[in-house]
């Protein structure tokens, strides 16, 4: 048997109460059996009735005092105990009716005992208004059962008095029968009643005094208010009425608890991210937009865990089983997908690492750099009100510009500085692999990129992939939807604007228009790339413009420019189907001597003009002579020509150009960005001389602002 159960069922605890019950019930039974019948005949029949009523009252109060809860306080639970430190003071003082009363800390129940409360060592509980522990009733006497205990004492005293008195009366009436059984039993009951009368009567008198004074047995024995004022007394009559007539005190143990279920969602808990659609509302540069994108929980956690210094992971391959709606779109770009997915895409810049890659449609939003650059160009077909407004209102995905509007450069696209020299070789290798995928239909005639509606917005749409990749910068408009727009009427280009970027498809179309069809065995002439002056200051550009005006005022009487060669906004990319592009720094070109052959150190011009506009430098071949065959370029693969054009074997034509020739090429395209007139918007008329035709093979030095000297071949 457990120790707690053994302690609860100790026989010694029940000996006093059992003896009291036996003596009470036994003596009364003998009284009613042997004494009451003679008294009812000799004295009055009311005697047994009176004794029966008193006895029942005694039994009722005895039962209530024994089995009733005295007012036990429940023990504090562990979580409540944590609020009070073990180093807390042993006593706390409260004021009751202007008198300081101490409350002692109960180490067993773990709370400060209220006033007049004490811990019972027998019951091991704190009892409200603890009086004493009575072994005769085997219970503590407290606030809730003190009334019944007090009435039990009063009724028991009266009952003992009645039993003893009515027994003595019976003996007096039957003096002749003292040897009889009835008289002998009556005398025995009288002895028992007399024995219990003295202590019970004394205890009853003591509690009568306590009730009249408003004290408890514990307070009286311990001398709590000895020599002082009792703050709990309300007068004799009020104290008696409070004990006998007040409403019963509430019970603290075993109260039915109504459990209420309350769902609490603290603000610091984030909701679970499901694999559904997440609506993202962003606000950048004053433009608001709501985008929907399917993004899994795992991808969000990876993005949040990455630091700003860590390198971004390579873009994932598209999951065709999950994005079933993309299969039809992916069939249009099978060739470039197969060539690009096998290679590592260029790393994403750090400032765009945490930008989610959104696109114009929800279906193609989860594609990596290459596929999303080809499948999500629908927004690029929407024409802005004007180029000037589009330059003042950058794309809502672009990085916000911190420059005031009055100090911004007139050139467009400066929000993303891009150096075509350092990244030319890498982007060229990627674009040449994609070249065959671009030829989906007959090439249309396009005069300038500024004449289409995709001038600036198409470039800004490339940043929706979340990064400025090489493909998105070099191919701003290579979607199938873009081709359908090209067949329509071409509006006049706005003045002072030429896009610094041109797609590989546009370059292919312009190359097909510029050059006549070559023989199958003939080498393909090289088309240089246009010049970007985004990084030059305004003063340098102004000096170059003045030199350009001088060149236009003195056109040569010799070669006339063909109608299709007046476009200066052409950027010859490796995917254009002609000469491959290999970039080299300006320092390398300056260090290379003229005596080195192209085979020993091939130096390709980074910028240039069409063949009709290119001046004859020291190392440039004659127009009529075929270019020397220098071997196939290692970085690029051959591709098919447009329909109707015989296939030509692509060779690397890399003539030597001195730094002077480079300056000449830069001068020819000095007005490509932000100038009053665009020299590449339309071909010149039949009577108009070419804009930048060279006059002679000499070189002139022009001094610019800041002491900079430019060598321009004229």
Swiss-Prot record:
GO cellular component entries? dendrite; glutamatergic synapse; nucleoplasm; phagocytic vesicle; plasma membrane; postsynapse
Q: Could you tell me which residues carry Phosphoserine?
A: 247, 296, 299, 345, 380, 398, 406, 409, 425, 429, 432, 529, 554, 620, 693
Catalyses which reaction(s):
L-cysteinyl-[protein] + hexadecanoyl-CoA = S-hexadecanoyl-L-cysteinyl-[protein] + CoA
Q: Give residue spans, biased composition: Pro residues.
A: 683-692
The residues forming the signal peptide are: none
| List of residues that carry Omega-N-methylarginine | 616, 696
Which segments sit on the Cytoplasmic face? 1-13, 74-148, 213-714
- Compositionally biased spans, kind Polar residues: 388-398, 445-478, 667-678
For the keyword Transport, the answer is yes
Major localization class: membrane
Subcellular location field: Cell membrane
Enzyme class, one word? transferase
Q: How is it modified after translation?
A: Phosphorylation regulates association with endocytic proteins and its subcellular localization. Phosphorylation by LYN during fatty acid uptake leads to inactivation of the activity. Autopalmitoylated. Palmitoylation of the C-terminal tail regulates stimulation-dependent plasma membrane motility.
Amino acid composition bias (Low complexity), ranges on this chain: 359-373, 422-432
Residues on Extracellular side: 35-52, 170-191
* Superkingdom field: Eukaryota
Recorded topology in the membrane:
Multi-pass membrane protein
Q: Which residues carry this modification: Phosphothreonine?
A: 294, 303, 348, 350, 411, 436, 658
**Transmembrane feature ranges:** 14-34, 53-73, 149-169, 192-212
Instruction: List every position bearing Phosphotyrosine.
Output: 91
State what this protein does: Palmitoyltransferase that catalyzes the addition of palmitate onto various protein substrates such as CTNND2, CD36, GSDMD, NLRP3, NOD1, NOD2, STAT3 and S1PR1 thus plays a role in various biological processes including cell adhesion, inflammation, fatty acid uptake, bacterial sensing or cardiac functions. Plays an important role in the regulation of synapse efficacy by mediating palmitoylation of delta-catenin/CTNND2, thereby increasing synaptic delivery and surface stabilization of alpha-amino-3-hydroxy-5-methyl-4-isoxazole propionic acid receptors (AMPARs).
Member of which family?
Answer: Belongs to the DHHC palmitoyltransferase family. ERF2/ZDHHC9 subfamily.
Domain observations: The DHHC domain is required for palmitoyltransferase activity.
Q: What is this protein called?
A: Palmitoyltransferase ZDHHC5
């Amino acid at each position: 048997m457990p120790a707690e159960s053994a302690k609860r069922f100790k026989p010694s605890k029940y000996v006093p109460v059992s003896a009291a019950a036996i003596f009470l019930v036994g003596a009364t039974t003998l009284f009613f059996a042997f004494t009451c019948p003679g008294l009812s005949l000799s004295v009055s029949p009311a005697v047994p009735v009176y004794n029966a009523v008193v006895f029942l009252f005694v039994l009722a109060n005895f039962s209530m005092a024994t089995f009733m809860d005295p007012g036990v306080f429940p023990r504090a639970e562990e979580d409540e105990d944590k609020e009070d430190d073990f180093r807390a003071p042993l006593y706390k003082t409260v004021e009751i009716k202007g008198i300081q009363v101490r409350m002692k800390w109960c180490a067993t129940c773990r709370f400060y005992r209220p006033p007049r409360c004490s811990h019972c060592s027998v019951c091991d509980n704190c009892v409200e208004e603890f009086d004493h522990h009575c072994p005769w009733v085997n219970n503590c006497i407290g606030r809730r059962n003190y009334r019944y205990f007090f009435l039990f004492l009063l009724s028991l005293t009266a009952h003992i008095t009645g039993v003893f008195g009515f027994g003595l009366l019976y003996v007096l009436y039957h003096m002749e029968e003292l040897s009889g059984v009835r008289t002998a039993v009556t005398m025995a009951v009288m002895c028992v009643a007399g024995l219990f009368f003295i202590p019970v009567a004394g205890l009853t008198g003591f509690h009568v005094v306590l009730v009249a004074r408003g004290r408890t047995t514990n307070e009286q024995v311990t001398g709590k208010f000895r020599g002082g004022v009792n703050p709990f007394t309300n007068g004799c009559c009020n104290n008696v009425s409070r004990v006998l007539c007040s409403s019963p005190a509430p019970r603290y143990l075993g109260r039915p608890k109504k459990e209420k279920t309350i769902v609490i969602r603290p603000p610091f808990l984030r909701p679970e991210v499901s694999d559904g659609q997440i609506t993202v509302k962003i606000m950048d540069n004053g433009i608001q937009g709501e985008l929907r994108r399917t993004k899994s929980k795992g991808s969000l956690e990876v993005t949040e865990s990455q630091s700003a210094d860590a390198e971004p992971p390579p873009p994932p391959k598209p999951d065709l089983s999950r994005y079933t709606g993309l299969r039809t779109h992916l069939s249009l770009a099978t060739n470039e997908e197969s060539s690009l997915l096998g290679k590592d895409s260029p790393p994403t810049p750090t400032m765009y690492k945490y930008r989610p890659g959104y696109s114009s449609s929800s279906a193609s939003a989860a594609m990596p750099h290459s596929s999303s650059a080809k499948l999500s160009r629908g927004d690029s077909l929407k024409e802005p009100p004007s180029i000037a407004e589009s330059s003042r209102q950058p794309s809502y995905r672009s990085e916000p510009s911190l420059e005031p509007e009055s100090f911004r450069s007139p050139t467009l696209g400066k929000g993303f500085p891009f150096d075509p020299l350092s990244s030319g070789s890498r982007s060229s290798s990627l674009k040449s692999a994609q070249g065959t995928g671009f030829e989906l239909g007959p090439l249309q005639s396009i005069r300038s990129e500024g004449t289409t509606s995709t001038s600036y917005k198409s470039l800004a749409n490339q940043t929706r992939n979340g990064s400025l990749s090489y493909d998105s910068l070099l191919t701003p408009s290579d979607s199938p939807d873009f081709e359908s727009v090209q067949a329509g009427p071409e509006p006049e280009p706005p003045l002072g604007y030429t896009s610094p970027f041109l797609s590989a498809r546009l370059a292919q179309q312009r190359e097909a228009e510029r050059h006549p069809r070559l023989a199958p065995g003939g080498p393909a002439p090289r088309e240089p790339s246009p010049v970007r002056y985004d990084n030059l200051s305004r003063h340098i550009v102004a000096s170059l413009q003045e030199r350009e005006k001088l060149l236009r005022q003195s056109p040569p009487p010799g070669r006339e420019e063909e109608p299709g060669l007046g476009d200066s906004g052409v950027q010859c990319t490796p995917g254009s189907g002609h000469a491959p592009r290999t970039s080299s720094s300006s320092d390398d070109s300056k260090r290379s001597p003229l005596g080195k052959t192209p085979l020993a150190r091939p130096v390709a011009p980074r910028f240039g003009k069409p063949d009709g506009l290119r001046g004859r430098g020291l190392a440039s071949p004659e127009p009529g002579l075929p270019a020397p065959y220098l071997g196939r370029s290692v970085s690029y693969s051959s591709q098919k020509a447009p329909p109707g054009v015989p296939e030509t074997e692509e060779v690397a034509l890399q003539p030597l150009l001195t730094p002077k020739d480079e300056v000449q090429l830069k001068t020819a395209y000095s007005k490509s960005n932000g100038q009053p007139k665009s020299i590449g918007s339309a071909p010149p008329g039949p009577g108009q001389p070419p804009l930048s035709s060279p006059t002679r093979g000499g070189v002139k030095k022009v001094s610019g602002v800041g002491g900079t000297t430019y060598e321009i071949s004229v």
